[in-house]
Regions:
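Extracellular adhesion/carbohydrate-binding repeat motifs centered on closely spaced tryptophans
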Residues: 2-458
């Protein structure tokens, strides 16, 4: 009876040990040999084979989980094993992120404190590939390290956030260049994460932008030769250079606002460097980014039913200007401070002469806006300028279309009546009249105001 109690006590002890020991339990062979299977010794786990030897440098499966026995036969924990990783419990991880302290953190500038890996379904770290994880895309290099920041993969540039996720859309990034012009620039990444590199007028959310080496362009931009053609398609862009001063034209340029959008409508800005005067503001008008400009001299453009003049530099004109006409001729025009072409009577101050002048410009028809050339309301105009005699002389001759007319200081043509007669030339009969200026010159005119003779008073 005592023997039975002793056996029960041993069995009870064995059952208790089995209850508190993990599933790593082997089978005893002899009283002095190691058990086959898992054994815990001094806090470490080992696996013994049928010869009682601890297996080393190999993976061992237990149930659904894999474990690694190192060179000392100790079950590894919380470490990388080639392309695998075992957690604190020794199990090989899968479908899981793992962070590892970066050994170079203290030795390299901008080195991350931790390196991140992702272990796939087979337990291997993802390497040299993209991976979609929980709805976001990540890239892992050849060592399996999750990448951040700007990277190049298969010739395409991408940007990964601090969390490693691939970014799309607009991103403001510091420029890695010594050029003081570029401190930081805007870049755009499409819906696959690829950076837009060199493209003219890329349409993004209804607006047009141009990129050179990925940088969004602002201000004046010289189009590549192939972009000048009206193909209607997005073009390849290359870095722009200021046009030589000798060209003096904005042909081939486009303008982009500070937010990168292609300009349309009016802008008050500096002109193209090397073409317009530096540090001066001018008015420009843009259509699809291109400035209205003359091919030579000054030309007229219609904007919202109003006429404006622009030079070859694209600068809007004000004041009295000589403008090229479509037929190859030129004409005088007048533009107010807003650049709008004026018609009818205009009083204009001539800064060069330091005097106020009276002008008249056609009010309608194909010559609208052009300086009037001829006699209107008995006032004589030459290419728009009212011809006037010096007030001290009272009268002066003016040539118009091959005839000499006599005008007074108000520009009025001096005419004879049908019944008046000339004292200086009585032989002419009726329809002539004499006018004497302050120099005692006598001018004889007919009913049209055409001078018939000039004599000195006796």
């Amino acid at each position: 009876m005592k023997k039975q109690i002793k056996v029960l006590a041993v069995l009870s002890t064995a059952m208790f040990m089995a209850a508190v020991t993990p599933s790593f339990v082997g089978t005893a062979s002899t009283a002095y040999a190691k058990s086959v299977g898992w054994t815990e010794e001094n806090g470490n786990w080992y696996y013994y084979d049928s010869y009682g030897e601890a297996i080393t440098d190999t993976w061992k499966k237990n149930g659904d989980d894999w474990y690694y026995l190192d060179s000392d036969g100790i079950r590894a924990a919380d470490r990388q094993i080639d392309e695998y990783y075992v957690g604190e419990d020794g199990k090989r991880v899968s479908m899981k992120w793992v962070s590892v302290e970066n050994e170079d953190f203290w030795d390299e500038d901008d080195a991350p404190e931790f390196l991140y890996y992702y272990y796939g379904r087979d337990g291997k770290a993802l390497t040299s590939r993209w991976a979609s994880i929980n709805g976001s895309w990540y890239y892992f290099n050849e060592d399996g390290i999750m990448q951040t920041g700007s990277i190049t993969v298969d010739g395409y540039n991408y940007y990964l956030g601090e969390d490693g996720s691939r970014k799309t859309g607009w991103i403001l990034l510091a420029d890695e260049t010594d050029d003081p012009e570029y401190v930081e620039s805007w870049y755009y990444f499409d819906n696959t994460g690829k950076r837009i590199e060199n493209e003219v007028d890329k349409k993004i959310e209804g607006q047009y932008y141009t990129f050179v080496d990925g940088r969004m362009q602002t201000g004046w931009y010289k189009l590549p030769a192939q972009a000048a053609a009206e193909s209607g398609e997005a073009q390849t862009a290359t870095p722009s250079e200021a046009a030589p001063a000798a060209e003096q034209t904005v042909a081939g340029y486009q303008y982009y606002d500070e937010d990168g959008k292609r300009a349309s409508g009016w802008r008050t800005i500096e002109g193209v460097e090397g073409i317009s005067e530096e540090a001066e503001l001018y008015r420009f008008y843009f259509k699809n980014g291109k400035p209205y400009h003359a091919e030579k001299g000054l030309e007229l453009f219609t904007i919202e039913s109003r006429k404006y003049a622009f030079n070859t530099k694209g600068e809007m004109q004000t004041g009295k200007k000589v403008v090229n006409l479509e037929d190859g001729n030129v004409a005088n025009f007048y533009f107010d401070e807003e650049g709008v072409m004026k018609t009818g009577k205009q009083v204009i101050f001539d800064e060069d002469l330091g005097e106020t002048q009276n002008w008249y410009f056609h009010t309608d028809g194909s010559r609208k806006g052009q300086g009037f050339h001829g006699i209107k309301d008995n006032v004589l105009y030459v290419y728009g300028l009212r011809q006037e005699a010096d007030k001290d002389l009272r009268f002066a001759p003016v040539e118009l279309n091959g005839n000499q007319y006599l005008v007074n200081s108000n520009g009025a043509v001096q005419k004879a009546t049908s019944s008046s007669k000339s004292n200086a030339m009585p032989e002419l009969g009726s329809g002539y009249k004499d006018f004497k200026d302050e120099n005692d010159k006598v001018w004889t005119v007919n009913t049209e105001g055409v001078i018939q003779s000039q004599n000195t008073a006796q």
